[in-house]
């Protein structure tokens, strides 16, 4: 499984959406956010925040299938493309990912600081493009971070039966 640049991620997501539409297979995306990444960068420098993001990406990779893809759509965010995953499978992956990532702590100034991880889930529907799918996952992650600002949470769009 490779980490993708923003442009490669966009291309891969477009390909998977086209395949999902053509073949009728499901597709989900997870957006993993580190809510306190800007604070880490401001207080301890960009190097520490980059190291934290790289560590989260590495831990995330170990929870995924070989053909799932990870990319960085925005600051403090990692997007996971889950080809063939429907809503319930996406929720299972999101919860597993969150369980693993919520225990991560990063060392700064001799102290181990927790990362505020949120995971948002979006399931592709006919007529939804890549930007909208990412926006749905981002909105779900934002809802999750509002629910548990000091720890981690997972949320999915209302279409999957979650608030």
Regions found by a protein language model. Give the residues of each.
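Conserved long alpha-helical elements within nucleotide-processing catalytic cores of c-di-GMP signaling
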Residues: 2-17, 21-28, 35-61, 71-75, ...
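Catalytic-core segments of nucleotide cyclases and related cyclic-nucleotide turnover enzymes
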Residues: 9, 91, 95, 109, ...
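Residue-level recognition of strand-loop junctions within catalytic nucleotide-signaling folds
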Residues: 42, 81-86, 102, 124-125
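Catalytic core regions of nucleotide second-messenger enzymes
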Residues: 71-74, 102-117
